[in-house]
Regions:
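Repeated loop/turn-to-beta-strand initiation elements of outer-membrane beta-barrel proteins
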Residues: 7, 61-65, 120-125, 164-169, ...
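Membrane-embedded beta-strand positions of outer-membrane beta-barrel proteins
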Residues: 9-11, 65-67, 113, 123-125, ...
Length: 353
């Protein structure tokens, strides 16, 4: 900003449109897919205020303060998005506890503080409004705090080492939510209950994560070219979370061909892990209703783990135009063993002006 050093302000408005292939062709409509083969799909085809924040850095103190409307994955659990599949793109915590952790394009009132411990490490903490009203299609520009259930408090340590001249970035983080959370299965006495009203209400919820980005090789003439690996793991509170967590690994080779030094090829695998307590609850419900036929409308689908794989090639035609042909593969969409595996041919395009 003019006249202000180390200061930045940003406002972004987004609009998503189109149909979801995962919903229309891949997943069981009773469960949906944990991921989505189109990462840009989700949260409704509506206009939204996706960023409206002010950030100020205090270089002498090593502090950066940020306040305004933002999403959690912008500054915590952040990871690159080098795939079209959702579970191989960006902050993964939002995919396993989407009722609390909001990624783009959702925003909430928030503030966070980053303190640089030394040139290679920092510690960040934030306070984010926990308000499900912001996810509604009719609340794309909601600025009210009406409907807030509490706050979500993330903390993260970031380390940026170099091993033999190869850049790395490691994130160790966790969050605690003060919003009430209903037990997946049991009441206060530890007895299984199918009725939501009879289950125990916990006074909070937590998650922990680890993200690693490490370059493994590089070219002598261009250190940006070479093989890199991305790891992304997160674990949820098993008492209150239907999804226990997710694991992701991806390999990317940038500049594989001398004639295309800015292009890259990636292969990623992601697993979404279902809480065993959720499976137990659904099996119990089917037993009580004496339903065994999966086609019966009264049958409650049992959900297991879901696996997503994607191979893609990123073609950077120019600094402002990118094409990414890709082949995603989905195993047990929505954790449904009865479904056939799905192969998809996709194309991501990106235009920057």
């Amino acid at each position: 900003m003019s006249g202000w050093q180390n200061t930045e302000a940003k406002i972004s408005i987004s609009k998503r449109e189109g149909r979801s292939l995962s919903t229309d062709r891949i997943a069981d409509p009773r469960t949906g897919q944990f991921s989505n083969v189109q990462e840009i799909s989700g949260r409704g085809p509506v206009w939204r205020l996706s960023q409206a924040w002010f950030q100020k850095g205090f270089e002498d103190q090593g502090l950066t303060v940020k306040v305004g409307r933002m999403n959690m994955g912008e500054d915590f659990n952040s990871a690159p998005c080098e795939s079209q599949n959702l579970t191989l793109c960006g902050a993964q915590v939002g995919k396993t506890v989407s009722e609390l952790w909001y990624n783009w394009p959702i925003t909430v009132w928030a503030a966070n503080l980053k303190y640089d411990l030394n040139p290679t490490s920092s510690l960040s903490v934030g306070v984010y409004e926990s308000n499900p009203e912001n996810t509604k299609k009719s609340k794309g520009f909601n600025l009210s705090t009406d409907g807030s259930k509490g706050v979500l408090i993330p903390i993260e340590f970031v380390w940026k080492p170099k091993f033999n001249g190869l850049n790395g970035l490691y994130r160790f983080g966790a969050f605690y939510s003060t919003a009430d959370a209903i037990d997946v299965l049991n009441d206060e006495n530890g007895q299984a209950q199918l009725s939501v009203e009879q289950r125990e209400v916990h006074s909070g919820k937590y998650n922990t994560w680890f993200v690693a980005q490490q370059q493994l090789t590089q070219h002598q003439d261009n250190p940006k070219r070479g093989l890199s690996v991305l790891l992304n793991f997160n674990i949820n509170d098993k008492a209150t979370s239907e999804i226990l967590g997710s694991q992701q690994i991806a390999l990317q080779y940038k500049g594989m061909f001398d004639a295309r030094p800015n292009d890259s090829m990636s292969l990623g695998v992601a697993r979404t892990e279902v809480n065993k307590r959720l499976k137990k609850k659904k099996k119990l419900e089917n037993e009580l209703n004496q339903v065994t036929d999966v086609q019966d409308p009264a049958y409650v689908p049992i959900q297991y783990d879901e696996t997503n794989v994607e191979l893609n090639y990123t073609y950077n035609w120019s600094p402002s135009i990118m094409f990414r042909p890709n082949i995603p593969y989905v195993h047990q969409a929505g954790g449904r063993k009865e479904l056939n595996d799905a192969w998809v041919i996709g194309l991501t395009t990106r235009l920057n002006f």
